Amino acid sequence: MASEIPEFGSAYAAEQLRRSRHPLRRLIKKFYLDHVLGEIEAGPTIDFGCGAGQLLSRLPAGSVGLEVNPHLVEALRCEGLDARLYDAYSDDFSLSQLEAGRYRSFTISHVLEHFDDTPAVMRKLWRACARLGVTTIVAIVPGAKGYASDATHRTFVTREWVRDNGLDYCEGYALERADYFPIDKASVGDWFVFHELHLVYRRKA
């Protein structure tokens, strides 16, 4: 049962919301969110796995957050955000509940590393984005130390991994940039837990 999985439960949601409201965490998170906001296109954005809504709350008007935890969805809706309960597996990652032609960008932050079948998931989501008319996709994954810090992580995504899995070009999108943040050097992630890899894809005609 989904309700028995911690990530779907009320305790997990409460902890995510508590952490998102901590003053120091908010200050640090703003630094990271500012960087993401500079990577997306102006206009409505789809935030896949929106969690506690830190990014969703700063996205352009008309943006939508998709989240598997119903308690987080309820909390975000109470804050006036367009958060929607979404079971990606039952929908085969097709984003079928979203209307084509409304969204410019798609973000997926600290989600891809949780899948065993990440290449297949990316191809399905990127294909869905193409159907919706999305022009920019930003995928964010942890560096080495961040990846190792969570036992639920299944796939370690690096620049080399993207290349080796044939994902430099994916479902009509070309990888424009693959940069590490806050320092663009992969080895920083060996000791700094908050190091990230940002993959920026653009739609090609």
Task: List where the protein language model places each region.
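Short catalytic/ligand-binding loop motif for oxyanion handling, primarily in non-cytosolic enzymes
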Residues: 54-57, 145-149
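Acceptor-substrate binding/catalytic loop of class I
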Residues: 146-165
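A short glycine-rich, Lys/Arg-flanked "PGG" loop and its adjoining helix->strand segment in the class I
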Residues: 120-134
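Conserved beta-strand signature within the Rossmann-like core of class I S-adenosyl-L-methionine
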Residues: 132-142
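Short, histidine-centered active-site or binding-site loop motifs used for metal coordination
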Residues: 16, 141-145
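A structural helix-start
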Residues: 115-119
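Conserved N-terminal segment of class I S-adenosyl-L-methionine
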Residues: 1-101, 105, 109, 122, ...
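Short catalytic micro-motifs in class I SAM-dependent methyltransferases
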Residues: 110-114
